[in-house]
Design a protein with these regions (language model features):
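Alpha-helical membrane segments of multi-pass proteins
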Residues: 1-234
């Protein structure tokens, strides 16, 4: 809730809505890389199951937790809401800004659902699959629009180009900073999650190996061998 307030209220909310493309991009990162996954992680599984059952949303939640659905819809939202047309039209009024923020949050919930859904069976089961999904959906694809913003030689958004300058920051420099925020800002979250998944994978593999060895040892005990020999003699 604190991060949601920081992204929405003054000063970041005002700067992102009317003055700085870089603040706009920082809002996007907070909604999608922090608020969304923490929202899923903050819901106990029993509560999620009860809500899904009462509202008959279990099947729908399972479908939106598919990696193809989450990855495609998130990146569509990312590209659509950062197009010059969308920014210049939606950021000019309070309702449009609210709608854009809300769509970002929905996109974040969609893209993180296959990884941290509160309902266990809705998560991806393969650790390599989870890591590949995060790398592609949150690492590779967003780098494309980030590159356009970073290397564009002129302002793409009229609303930020015509806004009063903040601390003397030019519109082009501000836009380049926005591209860098989009490209680099999510790296700690994405790669931190990938490292955590690698550790979980290692621990799960170690536990499976220990269980397998324990079963083999149980089958190799003298009592088991004597029983096997007796059965063979009979």
């Amino acid at each position: 809730m604190l991060l949601l307030w920081v992204a929405t209220d003054w000063p970041l909310g005002l700067l992102g809505a009317s003055y700085l493309a870089s603040a706009h991009m920082l809002q996007f990162l907070i909604y999608t890389m922090a608020v969304a996954p923490l929202f899923w992680l903050g819901i106990p599984e029993w509560m999620a199951r009860r809500i899904a059952g009462r509202l008959r949303l279990y099947r729908l939640m399972g479908r939106i937790a598919q990696p193809v659905v989450g990855g495609v819809l998130f990146n569509f939202i990312l590209i659509a809401t950062h197009s010059p047309w969308a920014v210049d039209n939606f950021r000019t009024n309070q309702f449009g800004s609210f709608l854009m923020d809300f769509v970002w949050l929905i996109g974040g919930l969609l893209v993180w659902a296959p990884i941290v859904s509160p309902i266990t069976e809705h998560r991806m089961t393969s650790y390599p699959g989870r890591m590949a999904y995060l790398f592609l959906a949150l690492g590779v694809v967003p780098a494309v629009p980030a590159g356009f913003l970073t290397f564009a030689g002129f302002p793409l958004y009229a609303i930020y180009e015509l806004a009063p300058r903040v601390h003397g920051l030019s519109a082009t420099t501000d836009q380049q900073l926005a591209g860098l925020v989009m490209k680099l800002g999510g790296i700690p979250v994405v790669w931190g999650t990938i490292v955590a998944l690698m550790y979980q994978w290692s621990e799960a593999t170690r536990a499976e190996s220990a269980t397998f060895r324990a079963k083999n040892n149980a089958l190799s005990t003298p009592e088991r061998l004597d029983q096997s020999n007796t059965e063979a003699d009979q």
